[in-house]
Structures are given as C-alpha cells and as structure tokens.
Amino acid sequence: MENIEKKLMLGDLLFPTKTFNVLSDFGADEPFLIDGDSLILYLFSTFNISSHKIKDKQLLSTDKCQSILFFHYFESFIANVLNRKTKFQIFFIDENQYFYKNNTLKLIRKICIDYYINNDKKNVLNNSNVQFTLIKSKWWEDFSSIESYLLENMFSFMLVLFPAQESFEKYYRVDIQEVFILKTMKFLDYVVEFNSISFEGSCIETIIYGKGTMFQRGYPYFCNKEFFKQIDSFYNNEFENFNSDKLSFKDQNQILFNQQQSENRDNEINLLISTMFNNDISNNLNRIYCIYLVLLESLSIRDRGFILPTCYKIDENVLNFLDNASYKNLLYLQQVSDSSSSSSNNNNNNNNNNNNNNENINLDYLDFKLFYQILIQIQIKLPKDLNELNNIFGEEIIIKSKLIWNNVKKDFGYDIGEFDNFELFSNFQDRNNNLNDIIQEMERRTKEINSIDNSIYLVENDFIRSVAPQAYEYLKPFQSENYPDAESTINTRFIDNYHFHSTRTIEPDAFSIKLKETTFKTKKHKQRAEDKSVGSFKKYADSLNDPRNILIINKLNPTKEELEKERIKKEKEDSKKSYKKQSSSSSSSSTTTTSTTTSSTIKPKSEIGKLLESRLNQDKKRYESELDDCKSIKSFLKFLNNLDLLTSLPELYLQYFDHLINFLVKQKEDLIEEKKRTILLERKQQSKTKTHIELSEYEEKEIETSLELGIKEKSQFYQMIQKYLRSFITEKSKILSTKLQIDFANRFYTISKSLIGLSDLSNFINDHWKLKLPKLDESDVGNQQLKNSIEFQLKHSPDTLIRNTGSVEDSRVRHFKPDAWQVELLDIVDKRESALICASTSSGKTFISFYCFEQILKESNDGIVVFVCPTKALVNQMYAEVLGRYDKNYQAINHRPSNHKMVGVFTRDFRLNIETCQILITVPQCLEILFLSIMNTHFIQRCRYIIFDEVHQIASSVDGAIWERLLVFNPAPFLALSATLGNLTDFHNFLKKIDPNRKVSLIHYQSRFNDLKNFFLCQTPAKDNKSFPTYTIEPLHPMATLDQKKTGLSDISPDLKLIAGEAIQMYQVLKEKLGYEKVNHLDPVKFFANIPNKQFNLEKQHIEIYQAELKQFYTNLPSMTEKQLVVKALTSPKYNDSLKFDWASEITNIVLELQKQDLLPALFFSFNRSLCSRLAQRVYNDITHRNTNPNIIEEKKQLDLVIERFQKSLGRALADLEPNDPEKMELERLKAKRASLDYLKPQFGNLLSSDIDEKVKKDPLAPALTQGIAAHHGGCDKNYLRNVEYLFRSKKIQVVFATSTLAVGVNAPAKSSVFLGDSPYLNVLTSKQCAGRAGRRGFDNYGNVIFVGLPKQKINRLLNSRLSNIIGNSVVSPSLCLSLVSRYDYSTNGSANKSNEENKVQVKENEKEREKEKEKEKEKEKEKETIADNWDDDDDKKEITVADNWDDDEEETAESTKTTPATTPTTTTTENTPATTTTTKTPTTTSLKKLSSEDILDVQILKKSTKSLLNNSFFLGNPLQVQFQFLFSIDYLYRETYLSKDCVPMDNFSGIVTHLSYLEPFNFTFVSLLKGGVFDNLPTNQKDCDYFIIHILSYLFCVQNIPSIYVRSPSILILPPLPPTVHKIIKNHNDRLLKTFSTYLYVYKKYLKSTNDFLPFSSNDLKDSQKTTTTTTTATTSTITNKWNENFEKLKPSTENFNTGDLLSGIFKVSNLKKLKNILGSNTYFSTRILPYCNVDGSPVNSYLLDFYKHSQKKPLIEDNKIKESDLWTLLKEFSLILKVIATALTRRNPDSPISLAFSGVAKRYIQKFSDNFDH
C-alpha cells in the first residue's frame, strides 16, 4: 500500500474551517459520531499535537503503558463531552484491529471493546446520551454495513483523528486511515478533527472539514481497486497470522480454559502467558513479572505514582518481553471472548471460569511503569539471597510471588525452574543506564515535586471578601505567609476615565443630564452632525413605519403626587356643585337650549349628506354600467368581494349575484353545446353512413361533469360566500333587513349547490334562513371530489381560517389590537417586572419594546431604557424604527433649552448621544463597557429597563459569555426576547435565580400567525446534450421527514406542525391505509361536529388541535409497518437521496423558476460571504446577458463613435455654446439616446436609479441592484446593507443572497426563505431563524421555505428536530476582574476626585512614612489577622447566601468602613514581581459617610451585581468554581503588578488591558512585551520601526493561521519568526501564569476530593476498591506493602499533594496549556480562555497585516494571502482600531516617550492607508 504513489494529499480533497464551537454550529442536541480507534490513538499521541518544542512528547506511552491511566483519560474525555449536554456514539470496526502496529495498543483496544461494548452489563456508563457500537465490516471491500449505520443514525459529523503526527504512523497505518476518512465522507458532509479539539468552558472547539472542490476528482486517487486489493492482502495476512497464533495458543494451553480457579487464578494465568514463549529471554524477567503481578494487585493506584526519568533507556529485550506479553494476553482475551460467544450461542451456562464473564473485565490490566521500577531495583541491588529480596519488596510480597510461581508449575505442569534462583538475579545488570544516576534523578525530581509551593496570594479588600466569601474562606489556609518585596516603580493609581479612541478625559458627570456652559459653544456644530446622522436614516425609517403615525410627546404623564392633587381638586369641585342644584339645573336647561339652537344651526351636515348621496348615486350608475360589461368571473368577484357599499346598495349586489349566476349557467350551457357539436361532428366524419347520430344520456352527463368549474374558481366563490356569512352571522351586524338577508341567502344557496357543490353548506344556509328548500345530499351536487365544506376549508381555503389570537382593544397600544399574551406583557411592564418572552418569529414580540420606550419617554426626562441587539445591522434598524415612531420635545416639556436627546446609539464604530439619551440602542460588548466604566454611576441609576433581543445568543461561542455576564450583572428590570430557546424552563429558572427578589415571568407563545409551507427543489437532468435540466418546486409534507433512518422511522418532534392542507392529507392517507373504522374519530366532519358555524367559520386553533390528534394517533400506532405505510404515502417519490446537485451553476434558472411560481420576494440563505456575493453577481450577469439584444450592443458602439466625432468637431467651441444652440441640443439628444440604451427594466422588482443611494453606487454590487438583486452579509458596506434592507422592504428588489445576518431580527419580510446548499453553520436553530423571515404577519398568508441542494437527511433533521439546549459560558476573566476592581476603587475613593498628579504626591508621602512604620509592622499584621478573623465570622453568617437584599448590602458596607483598617499601598514593582504590601496611615477607602449618596448606591449596586455574577453561572452549577476563577484572576493581576496588595488598581499599562479586553489573552501578552522592554530600542528608521511593531502585533491580534492545504502554495506569505527575546518574555509570562493557575486548580480539586472520580464512570468496577482510596498510604494499603512503601518513599511524590491522575501520569508541573487541559478533570469546567496564555509556537501565521502596510493593495491579500474578500475590511479595520487604542493609552501615560510617538505614528499611517483603500 505504501508503495502506491499518490499525487494528492488528504488536505487537497477537504477544506478546513476556522476553529469554532461545534456545539453552537451543529447544535448540542444533534447526534454525532466518534471513531473509537481515533480516540485511542488521540490519547496516545495528544501531546504531539502541541508545539514540537515541548519536551514531553506524549500524554500516554505504549512503552510505559498503564491501562488504568488510559481509561482515566478515556472516560474523562467522554465525561467532558457529555457534560456539554451532547448526544453521540462511539463506534469501532472490528477488522481495524489488524491495522494497528503495536501489540499493547491492540490489547488496550480489546479491553476497551470488551468492557464498554461486550460487557454483560447494559450501558456501563449509565448514560443514555452515549452509546458504544462494534461493527464487523471489511469496509474496503463492502462499505454497505457502515453506510447503513451512518444513514440510520443521521450523524451531523464524525470526530476523527487526522494522521498528521509521527506518532500516528508509529501506531497505525496512515494510508488506511486516510482512505477510511474519505470513504466515510461519501456519506457524511463533515468530519471534525481530534487534532485541535479543546474543551473551553461549555464549548467544544476544533476544526471542521467539508468536501473541497477536488473531492470528487481526487477520490479515485485514494480509493481505487488496486489500493483496496493491497489493503485486503495486508488484512488477510494479518488475520491469518493472528488466527494461527490463537489456535496454537489454545491447543497448547487448553488447560487455561478447563482448570478450576485457584485463589490467584488471574495472576497465574498472566504469569503463564508471559513466560510461555519467552525461553530465549532470561528467566529473570519471568520472576520480575511475577513480583510485578503481586504488586499490581496489592498496591493502591495512588501508590504507583512513580517518576520515571526520560533519560532512562529501556532495554530492547525488556520491550520485546512486554510486547510479547501484551500479544499473548490479547490472544488469551480473544479466546475468552470466542468461548463466551460460543457458550452464549449454545445456551451453555456451565462455564465456571469467571474470566469468561465479561462483567469482570479488569481495567487495571497493565502497569509497565511499575514493572520498570521493580526491574530497576533488582538491577541496582542485585539480590544474592532471599533476605535481600525481602528487604527490597517485603517478605509477604515475595511469599505471594513464590506461591504463584509454584502453582503455575503445579497446576499447569510447566517446568519453569525455581523462583529463588539468585544466581540469575545477581548476574542481571543494566548495561544501558547508570542506575545510580537514575535513582538520584528520581529522588531529585520527587523532592522537587514534593516541595512545589502551592501557596497563593490572597489580595483582599472589602469588595473581594464580600463578593467571593466561600472561596475566600476555603483558600485562606493556602495563603502565602511571605508576599514578595519589590522595588517601587509604580506610584500611580489607575483611573480608567478616558475613551479608548481618544485621550480626552471623561467627565465625572458624563452620564448625568445637565446643561453645561460648553453646550452653547458647541451646540451648533454638534447639532449639524446629529442632524446629518438622523437625516441619513430618514428614508430607512420611513420604510419601517408610516411617517404619518409618529407619536410626538410634548408633555409627561402626571406623577402620583400630581394625580393625587388632581383627585383632591376634583372632589372639591364636585362638593361645590352639590350645593348649587338650582343653578346646576338652570345651567342644564340653558345648556339644552343652547344645544338645540346649535344643532339647528349645523347646516353643513345636510350639505355633506347631499354630497355623500350624490357620490353614492354616481357609484351606483358606474357599477350598473360596469355590470353590463362583466364578461369574466374576475370582474364579478372584484365588486362582490368589496362589502363597503352593501348597506347602501343591497339591490345592486343582488343584481350582480343574479348576473353572475346567469353568466355561469349560460357559459356552461354554451360550452356543453359546443362540445356536443364537436363530438358529433367527429363521429359523423368517422361514420360512412348518413344515419342520425345522438349522444347517450350517460355521455351528456359526462360532458356536463367535465365542464364544471375548476377548484380555483370554486375556492374563490366559497371564500366570497364565507365573507358574507361571517358578516351576516358571526359578526352579528344588523346591516340588512331579514328580507334582504333571505334574498341574499337564496343566491348563496344556488351558488353553493350548483357552482361549488357543497351540500352541507347549502343545507346550512337553507336551515339558518328557513328558506324551505329541499334538503340536499352528496348525490344532489354532482360528481365532486369533496362533498363537505369542512374538508374544503382545510384543503382549498386554508388562507381564510379565522386567526383568533385573543386580540382585544387596549388603550395602551396604538394602531393594533394586542393578543392576549401581549396584554399580559403590557401588565408586566406597567408593574416594572421582568419577563422572558419566547414567541415564534413574526408573532409580534418586539412590540413590547416600543411600549417600554413609550412609557419611559412619557414618564420622565431622565429614565433610560437600553435595547441590546446582537448585530450592528439590528442596531441600525432599531434606531431607524425609534426615529420613525417617536419624537419628544424636551424644550417644550422643560420650558427651557435642554441637553436631552431621545435616542442614542453605541457601537464600536458609531457613537451618538450616549450620555444624554433616554433610549440607548447598543450591542452587548458596548453595554458591558458602560456597566464597567468607572464613570457610569449616573447611567446605571438611570436605567429603568434593559431589553435583550435575541437572547439565545447566550449560546454563541463568540460572545455568549458577554450576554450571560450582562444578564447576571444587570440590576434593572429586563425583558429577554427570543424565538428559539430549547431548554426554556432551565433558562427561566436561571434568570429567576439571579435575583430571587426580582420577579421574572415566562411568556411562551408557540403559534405562528402565518404558517410555513415546506418545499424542496427537484432537478430533472437534461435528456440529451441539446436540452437543459428542468426544475420543479415540490411540496414537502412534514411527516415525510420522519423517514430519517434506512430501516426505521424517527419520532415526531414537538416542533413539527401540520398546516390545514397537510392535516387533511394525512387523514386521507390514514383512512386509505388503515381503514375508515380505525380512524373514523379523526374524520373532520365528526371531529369538528360541535364547532358552531363549522361550514364556513373554522379557526386556525381548531386545526392545531386536530393536527395534534393526528400526530398522537400516528405515534400510538403499535405496528412499525403501519407507520411506514403512512409515511411512505405522504412522501413524494421525488423526495429521495438525489436532491444534492450543482445548484450554484444553475442559480439563475432556479431564481427564475421561483419568479415563475410567484414565490418572490425571497431571501436566499448561504452561509458563505464570498459565495453570496458571487451568486448575486452571477444572476445579474446572466439576466443582463439574456435581456440584452445583440443589435443594441452594435448600436451602442455606433452611437459612441458618433458622439466622440461630434465632440471632436466642436472642439473647444463646445464650452462656449448656449444651451439652446442647435449643435448643443443635438449632442444632448445623442447622449440621452445613448443613456436610454443602457437601461434595462429590472427583472426582479421595480426600482429607479434614484432609489440607489449615491454612497452605494460605487459599490461593486451596486449594478446588480438595478435588476432587483442584492447580497447581504457582514463583509458588505454598511451603507449598502442599509440601502438593500430599505429596497427589499419596499418590494423594489426581490432577490437577496444572505448569510445569517438577515436571520437575526432584521425586518426583511419575504414571501419565501430559500436554503442554498448545506453548511456546518446550518443547524436547527439557524434554520428556524432564517425560515421565520418568510410569511411575516400582515404581508402574506403563508411563508414558503424551500430547500435547494440539501441532502434529504439534512432536511429531515432541520424540520424534525427540537432546538438545542442553551449550555452557558465561563463568565470571569482577568480583564473583567481588573475593570470591576477599578470601578469599585474609584467609587470608594473617587469622592476626593484626585488627579493622577495628586495620587503621585500622595504615594511619595507614603514612601516617607514607610520607614517610620517598619517597626510597627508586626503588631499591625497581628491586628489585621484578628480583624480578618472577625470578618470570617461575619462572612459565615451573612455572605454565604446569594440573595442578599439591598439593605443588607448597605449595612454591610457601612460596617466594613468602621471596622476594617483599610490602608493604601505604597506600591513597589518590578517587571515580574508584584507590589509591596507595606501599609501607611493613609486610608485606601473613603468612609461611606464621606461619600455621596450616589457613590454609596453605586457601591451597593456593584457589590450586589458582582455577587450575582460569581454565584449564578448558567453552565457552572457550583458557584465556588466561579469564585475560584475570580480569586485566581485577582491573584494573577497582583503578581503582574496591575493591583496592589490591598487591591488598588495601578496604572501599569492597565488602560491597554481594559480597552482591549475583548482580545484577551493577547492584551496581557502585549503589556508583558511592553514591560519586558521589547519596544524600548526601536529602529531609528521610521519604516523599519513601523515594520517591527506591525510584525510583533501580527502575531497577537487579528491572526489568520495558514491551513495545511495552503502551506504548500508558494504564493502564501508567512510572517518571519518572532525574535528570541519576544519568545523568552512570552514564555516567562506563561510559566508564571500556569504556576499560579495550577495552584488554584490543585486547591479546587482538593475541595472536590476528585480522586474519588479517577474513573468518572467505572470507579466501582475496579478490581480492588483499595485502589481508589483518598487517604494516606499508611492508612489504606495493607501491611504486605509496608516494606515497599518504606523503600520507595523518596522515589514517589506525596499522595497528599496530588490526585490519582497526576500521580500516575507524572504531570506535576504544568509547563504548557496542553498539559493543563489534560489535568483539568471532567468535574471541573475551568475554561482555559480565562487564562492570559499566549502560544505563538503553533502553525505559521499569515503576514497579510504587514503585507498590506507594505504595498497597500487589496488584490494581493485576496489572491496571495488567501484572505476572503468579505473578511478583509473587517480584519484591517479591527487592526487599525487596535493600533489606535494602544497609541491612545501610551500617549495618555507619557505623550513624549519614543514608544508613544512610534505607536501614534504607525497607527496614524496604518489608518490612513486603510482609509485610502476602503471608502467605507
């Protein structure tokens, strides 16, 4: 196989995506597949995935294999996946064992399969969300069994190990793994690699691979017959060899399977197996193996934690011995399995050998490290007699070893000599190692490990102690006694009071609304800017709302006090009136007289009446004249469907009905006669006789039946009658007299009977108006398919079903009647309560936001409501909506000039009225900035409501943590809106738990106002080369999606709904397949029998009940065969496995087909930005080419030549010509004619050139707009996007190709949502959001969802799956903690408003005081400890509970300032050491008595919100874990000199950290480079200086790694390596970080007692419970191991300090992130994202940022650097902002320093280059 030359590599056939969270993109509830062999190989090669510079190559080693350690990692991995609430299967292919190259791995694999798959226990993991499967398949020959398995289970992806490491080739056949991946990709769309997998909090992150463009062409290079033959030959050879060895082994050792079990049966067998075929090896190894078996059984797992130095070289003979032992054990276990299978098949249960029982599988089967330890002791001490051997291992150990040895000799009859042959031992020396050096190294390493300092630095103040009391108390015993001293270098307190983009200081009252003196100076300039901004949104706003409905607020609602005064005033007035009855009566009389006089003088009323009467007469004459001209059904219905004139001109309506009936009767008669004549004429011509030919009565009836109205016309007549009946009966309007109603009823009866053919409707009309006409039955209405009106409504008139949503009039809402659930929401807002609202898209949930806005605007001028959007597009839309709905006149309300603004916007690139607005529209990242800003006291206190739109974004792997932090940190009432929440109850409970004193209601409304119809596009291939493929849009019945499995059916999802037509179709299939008797109760006539007026007035709610009953009946069917019959009958024959095709090349024809079917306007969703743009361009080009006349092209050329010659002939005289000059006019005429030739009428829409904004016309996609085609994605210009949204809403364009940017809340109503092709980003959540854009309320009766080019299985999963559960996030990080501490420090010390200069003076004074205080330091420390103890008591009593009320917080804060001797630090720092903690008399916190009430309230809010943040993680159930993360972050900040010992924030580049917090961890890395002096000696040449800075930053920010598929391309530009000094600084920073975090992790694991969970699932299945002990060695191990433990005490780490996994693996010192991730454990959820760890040793980094600065060209970045065009603007813009932030922070610290000047210069120049290349 390896000799086959491959021209391609695996990466050429698959394309990788960026690393992202597979759970959020595929969906946590989507089942996926794990390749079991890949998992085994991954665990044995995981460290090879890390940097090649890491010394520890592997996590697990076959040479030093410990099987129990493998299963620890194996089960921990499974537990980690399960803890993310996933569903998956792990499968093994039995035949793959022969492709392993290592016998130990084969043995591990065998144990794994026996334990987890062949175990007699059912599901040993006791978890239904994971299943193990073993498949027997020679898949290279026949893939059908695996294909069936994949198709049956519909896995979303497979997790597999790519053969990218050397260790893989060492263990497994690389080429076979590659072929297996490709074969699997034939039936799976995506594979996910093990190589990059990482558990980050609630996320599982890795790289996803899809099929590349070369997949189909390259597949044969890998998967060819010749190659498969070689695989088969290799397999057969390995299989035969193994089978031969197995049979030989069985023949020679039949006694193994027949002997009765002895006391030490397991060990005897193991020893026998190991010794049997090793005669050529020294018998010493057999004896050592015997001792090893006894110790393996006797020692606890924790007592086997030896350190085996990497310098120890294992003898080749030993390796062969152990490898051979593994192989013989594999043969033995295989024989046991075969025997068990044979016994089971023969029902023979007489086998007494427990080893044959798969329940007793021993996971602790191998421990080669223990064997090497025994070997080393034997070889170094060379025992000469039994006493010496006993002194090494203990007498009891040797006795047991001899017993096993002798039993083997006796029981099995093998002559293996004597055990105590000490001549062999004494001559057994190690010639590869200096064993004394090895022992010394082991002792040194053990001593070093046991002396690891696990102490921590508890940086504390009142804030820290109060927000994390539990963790603080638990960490106290581990607190370091000696905090490091350092030289003073930092003497300035950090105050984050400036904007990230400007050095301008933020005023303390920035968020208070006051009219400042500077307002008058800057008002005009500022107003002009704001007017310009508002003006740009005017057209956008008008497309969202009718500008005539704008609400102008000129006054505020009265306050409670004002209402009370008004009530008292009214009571006084009423009491005065009661004493003046006479005057009151005379007044009443006078009023009556006046009224009479007034009424008699209203002359205009009669004139209006005459005018109305005149118009009515004109209308009557016009309609009467039109009646005579009516020649079609459409013309009759146009008048009859309009009931506006019914009360005024009922006779005219009756005339129209009569004419309509007569018209149809005559039309039918004429058609019958014409058809008769035609038939008779044909027969005459065919007949040769002249006899008279007549039609039979049957033939005449057939002709009459064939000429009945079509179903479309019948539906129109039915809906017309339905409208009249509802007006006359259900609406109970007394608009017509009874006589007139009877006249109308007679016409209705005739139409229902003769035209529509519904007997029950005719009988209803007859009975209701007592017409006394004959009762009809089905035979009286002709040969009709439908004979009752109920089925007719369901099947042919579902659009007119009553949509009764419980709407009622409510004075609080303008312009519409709110539904019942919306009224409940109004009440919640009026009470200032919170709510979680989950309602389907287009149901109208956003209305509550506008009610909230209106209430706040009317209530006061100071209150703020914040609207949080997930995207900037939604921010723009909401801003425009507010502008279009409201206007508030603050000057009229205040009676003076005002600084207030109604609405503001805050995004990273657009800021407007943030400080002065009442409605703030923002994104979550910017709201967090406001929450954490030290200047936001007034802002938070003014917040009345916060509205979180699309709150399911909390599940996002990108910014989900920010959403969660905002929800937890928010102190105000809130509304959380979403249409797609899976675990709704869990999420609601989480929101309630945040603040138990805050009521959070749940509003769950599942119904859609407009239902969705599902379709799929079917391609019919071309018949020959001359023809083209055709496309049909076929309806997709929801029940067809149940056919997900090849051999079965899936269950019905709760979200699967049937609309009316689908419900009646299902009933008819059930009746046909099962018989009417079984389903008669589901007969619509019977089911709806008790519904009043059912013949014309069914409601949508009735259908929902009916479809639920149908689904329940189907679910309860006992027979799978019956279910399959039903599903098959409801499935279109075209809905098969051939739905995937090359749709992109046919996109124009597809769009035209939708236009033909009247399915436009439509949103075409594709989740690739570049593809969206290309599709829009392609359709535009095709349409332009098709609609352009070739003759016009020639005419254009001729006209261009004429114009050019004409202009040349005029020459310079042209400029002097008058406008009315004939020559000038002729030239203008020619130009106008030329311009007219360029105009093409839009194919999709109706827009003019003026509809396209001037700013947009230069956009590359602008020409496509002229044909009604657009693209919409995050890479587009914002002006273009805004224009597209406006044009689409206005129906001026009808085709938009979009990513999910239009799926999240943007108002883009469409008739259809079209999914183009598959994508890993297309999951259930995304599909529901995208589909919800179709059929918006008030626009369409139905929404259409069309699937194009998606596999059937994917469509099934999207339509018949429940929404994924929200998992949650890790919410704490060092950057966040620094912001929290900075804000607290400013709130408690900001009342003095000290500037930085004042702080510097204060610190210098403190330094002078320090010398005087040194003598008193010890006494103060004692005093401090005493007070801290008092604090601890208080914490125990008060702080443990999460739900503290506001009063408790206030008392607690006030008390703390009285009792705690808070001190300010005299900070002393160096590069890598924390601040000194010497104290002075100067207080660090100001007494609350000295603070303002606003500052006190701010402190209370901050503490309460931070407590909530640390105690209410949606993902982490245990709040202590979050508190540990918080205190670790504080410790880290102290060690890195961002905080002092008393938790005072220091200005040590802290501004860069906080303002670049969203780029964590690289904000900290950059600061470490600054402090390390990387930029101290910059090149003097400006260009070289700029290149150096950008080179360094390109490794940290906006990094684009180069996938392996591109590395081979010479056109890719790779960044040069970082300088060694940079590497060293980063490494030192990483080492300090990991050391600190390891300590906290160690303490937390100690708290969890995690050694009990060494095997998360199988702890109780270990052979010896003693092996899981958590106490000390002397207390747990038996006496037989005392000697061993005594001799080896110096050679193994203390079991007290480390858990079992650490002891066995030898990972004691965490040197890299990969190691850290492997020791986290399955019961800890620490995300490594919270660590400011920077790894720059990974894959090559794209140099596009540096390249752009060098050549300033976009094209090379796209073509050479392979940066997507749609991403380029975003990346370069982001990098420009980063440069600006850094330059601002450095300039603020020291504007004249060379570093500040260098960064300011490069930032300015980079931004200029960016602006020159990008217009937007």
Swiss-Prot record:
Main location: nucleus
EC number per UniProt: 3.6.4.-
Region called Disordered, residue ranges: 338-357, 562-605, 1388-1487
Pfam families, A to Z: DEAD (PF00270), Helicase_C (PF00271)
Record's protein name: Uncharacterized helicase DDB_G0278827
Top-rank taxon, per record: Eukaryota
Domain Helicase C-terminal span(s) in chain numbering: 1198-1379
Compartments (UniProt record): Nucleus
Binding site for ATP: A839, S840, T841, S842, S843, G844, K845, T846
UniProt keywords, alphabetically: ATP-binding, Helicase, Hydrolase, Nucleotide-binding, Nucleus
Motif DEAH box: positions: 949-952
GO MF terms, alphabetically ordered: ATP binding; helicase activity; hydrolase activity; nucleic acid binding
Organism: Dictyostelium discoideum
PANTHER family with a match to the protein in the record: DEAD/H RNA HELICASE, PUTATIVE-RELATED (PTHR44533), DEAD_H RNA HELICASE, PUTATIVE-RELATED (PTHR44533:SF4)
GO CC aspect terms: cytoplasm; nucleus
Compositionally biased residues, Basic and acidic residues: 562-577, 1395-1427
InterPro entries: DEAD/DEAH_box_helicase_dom (IPR011545), Helicase_ATP-bd (IPR014001), Helicase_C-like (IPR001650), P-loop_NTPase (IPR027417), SKI2_subfamily_helicases (IPR052431)
Taxonomic lineage: Eukaryota, Amoebozoa, Evosea, Eumycetozoa, Dictyostelia
Residue span, Helicase ATP-binding domain: 826-999
